[in-house]
Amino acid sequence: MIIRISYDFAESISKQDLSDKCALIMRYGHYISCDHKTRLFICNAIKNCGSKTQTDLMLIYKGFDITQECRLYLTTIDLAAYSQHLQKLIELPSEILVENALYEWDLYKSLPEIYKHDQQFKNMFALLSKAIKRNRIVPFHGGGFNQYHLLLQQKDSSSYANVYQMKCCAIFDRDTDDAVTFSPKKNSLFHFLCGKKAGQIKDTDVYTLKQPGGWTWHMWYKRAVENYFPKEKYLELGVNVDEAESSVNGYDYYNIGNIHGYKKDMVPDLSSRMSRADFEKKVKLFNINGVQMSEIQLLLLKFVKLV
């Protein structure tokens, strides 16, 4: 996360308060964006009013230097707007809302490692992997998409009040027989997330890094997460998915969850067998602000916004 601090705001609060706020940002490894004048003001405030721990922290802090890549993909927060909620914003872990966290979280937490040698975004995925390993990004079990908007509302009005949109990414299955249909069963969820219903929503509302409505979320382009595992991985577990391959709607939109022998608890095992090449072989490509990326890369960049 990048915290933007203006000189006017830095000067408007006590030096002790400024020292405490900046030390908190530094301690959790976030970036501080400011001009040179403001940086000197912050450093002097910590030097003159901060504790020895805060002063020592400032001496080793590297977060004033922010790459263009970080500015492009990390979330930027204006401290003046979130001054009263900074502690909550910094200290509470970010959450990934998952339909079945018990089995699917193994997949999501392994993706940054699987993509660690990614040529386009390896620095961003390294930050993401580090955050997950440190439990700064954790799973939130949704129990099915029907409960999502209620769970999001609840968190947004209680423990994560005023900051949850920046601390959560919701992910769920498409659950349709093709790539052009959006399920009316998800109308309440779609409307909550972006103000549109199934008949109005477009790919550009979903497969982007700047989503309308303020929430960060992702709906799998294929029918469900199961459709991203290739046939041979299922065969390794003794599950024959030939019927999916020969179906009218094709492998990507067949309900693999109903195939005889398949169980949801196989997802962690399937995930452990996947390589980057396995995921990229038949994945959808998107053009995001002139940059071509795969759906998995896009999903991981949505997770990066939580770092």
Regions found by a protein language model. Give the residues of each.
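Non-catalytic accessory regions outside enzyme or core folds
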Residues: 1-53, 300, 307
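A short acidic, often aromatic-flanked loop/helix-cap motif at beta-alpha or helix-coil junctions
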Residues: 12, 145-149, 220-228
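RecA-like P-loop NTPase motor core
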Residues: 37, 42-176
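Charged/polar, solvent-exposed surface patches and flexible loops
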Residues: 44, 110, 150-153, 191, ...
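Short runs of predominantly hydrophobic/aromatic residues within well-ordered alpha helices
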Residues: 104, 225-226, 296
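Activity-critical C-terminal alpha-helical subdomain
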Residues: 171-279
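Hydrophobic, glycine-enriched assembly/anchoring segments
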Residues: 271-307
